[in-house]
A protein has these predicted regions:
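A structural micro-motif
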Residues: 19-21, 39, 73
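Thioredoxin-like thiol-disulfide oxidoreductase module
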Residues: 26-31, 63-133
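N-terminal "domain-start" segment that seeds a small globular fold
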Residues: 17-35
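Detector for the c-type heme attachment site
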Residues: 53-57, 126
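Bacterial Sec-dependent N-terminal signal peptides
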Residues: 1-22
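Short, flexible loop segments at the rims of nucleotide/cofactor-binding pockets, characterized by
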Residues: 19-20, 54, 98-103
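Short active-site neighborhood of thiol/selenol oxidoreductases, capturing the structured segment around
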Residues: 36-53, 75
């Protein structure tokens, strides 16, 4: 009886683990594209954005959606107000006005500005040659 319960728990946990999008950084996606070309999907979000959280839970948290994304794209989760560096098309994009004490009220990241994104959430796509679509 205990072994059956453990098996059910293990299978349920395995399903939960596989039902998540395997997010990476934009630089990691560009590196992966060099050896195995795939399109890139970028979830551009902010920490204060309610619809961003709903997108995570209801869409990216869906087992079928996450499996499709993991199999067909390099998925990137990008904080539009974060402080990560992005190397793209010979440019280094940063957020020079980032202030950790202003969590949820930071300036837009240069990469977000470069892409022309002004609202969140935004899902951006790049083809397998890293061209912004």
């Amino acid at each position: 009886m205990v072994s059956r319960s453990l098996l059910i728990l293990f299978v349920g946990f395995s399903f939960f683990v596989t039902a998540q999008v395997k997010w990476m950084s934009f630089d990691e996606a560009l590196t992966a594209q060099k050896t195995s070309p795939r399109n890139i999907i970028v979830d551009v979000y902010t920490t204060w954005c309610g619809p961003c959280k709903m997108l995570d839970k209801n869409t990216f948290g869906n087992a079928e959606v996450s499996a499709f994304i993991n199999e067909n794209f390099y998925p990137v989760k990008f904080n539009a107000e974060g402080n990560s560096k992005v190397n793209f098309n010979g440019n280094v994009f940063e957020n020079p006005k980032y202030d950790p004490s202003r969590q949820g009220r930071n300036a837009r990241h240069q990469f977000t500005v470069y892409l022309g994104i002004t609202g969140y959430p935004t899902v951006a796509f790049f083809d397998e040659n890293a061209n912004y679509l």
